[in-house]
């Protein structure tokens, strides 16, 4: 509802909580591609996008569903390890397309210390695609590997098997032991790096 004669109705996408136009304007002015990280309730989506007068052009992209379908990932598709692996995949595709630098775009996500969006950005930097980010907000290596998930699973196995089966039903249905997530993370990460070893010059 309007609040007076000088009230200005926000743009539709701002009203819907989809776009911060001021931040977008600043990123477009930089002249660099954007490393776009978005999370839904179940998935992580990462894109490298460049702005053109006719609209945004996606240079490279990755969806966490690919981790399960193509690389055998048995963990959750919306957690911190999945965010890192999805960011890794998008970054490698960006490098293959010739992108060396991008500005971070986390949309309207609140920049919380250790957030999943920063795990994806860390992955890009780890393989040589420069995306500025403060070290203080990046999740720890233990968290990126899923050590916290494995520890919680082990605790539930011993303290409450019923709760364990409820919380980790997806893992169990795939025949995967969540306490082995850190080891599994390294295996899937290496599969992705092996596929793009030509990009990394290995």
Swiss-Prot record:
GO terms for molecular function: 5S rRNA binding; structural constituent of ribosome. The keyword Cell inner membrane does not apply. Belongs to the universal ribosomal protein uL18 family. CDD domains: Ribosomal_L18_L5e (cd00432). SUPFAM superfamilies: Translational machinery components (SSF53137). GO terms for biological process: ribosomal large subunit assembly; translation. GO terms for cellular component: cytosolic large ribosomal subunit. InterPro entries: Rbsml_uL18_euk (IPR005485). This is one of the proteins that bind and probably mediate the attachment of the 5S RNA into the large ribosomal subunit, where it forms part of the central protuberance. Pfam families: Ribosomal_L5e. Keywords: Ribonucleoprotein, Ribosomal protein, RNA-binding, rRNA-binding. This is Large ribosomal subunit protein uL18. NCBIfam families: PRK08569.1. The gene is rpl18. Gene3D superfamilies: 3.30.420.100. Part of the 50S ribosomal subunit. Contacts the 5S and 23S rRNAs. It comes from the Archaea.
């Amino acid at each position: 509802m309007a609040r007076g004669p000088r009230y200005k109705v926000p743009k539709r996408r701002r009203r819907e909580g989809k776009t911060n136009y001021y931040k977008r304007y600043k990123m477009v002015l930089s002249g660099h591609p954007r490393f776009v990280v978005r999370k839904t309730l179940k998935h992580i989506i990462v894109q490298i996008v460049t702005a053109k007068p006719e609209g945004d052009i996606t240079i490279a992209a990755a969806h966490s569903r690919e981790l399960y379908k193509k690389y055998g990932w048995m963990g959750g598709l919306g957690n911190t390890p999945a965010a890192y692996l999805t960011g890794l995949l998008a970054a490698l595709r960006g490098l293959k397309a010739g992108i060396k630098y991008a500005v971070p775009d986390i949309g309207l996500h609140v920049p919380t210390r250790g957030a999943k969006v920063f795990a994806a950005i860390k992955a890009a930097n780890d393989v040589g695609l420069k995306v500025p980010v403060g070290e203080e907000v990046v999740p720890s290596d233990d968290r990126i590997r899923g050590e916290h998930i494995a520890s919680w699973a082990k605790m539930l196995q011993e303290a409450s098997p019923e709760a364990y089966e409820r919380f980790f039903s997806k893992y169990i249905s795939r025949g995967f032991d969540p306490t082995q997530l850190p080891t599994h993370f390294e295996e899937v990460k290496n599969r992705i790096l092996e596929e793009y070893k030509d990009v990394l010059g290995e």
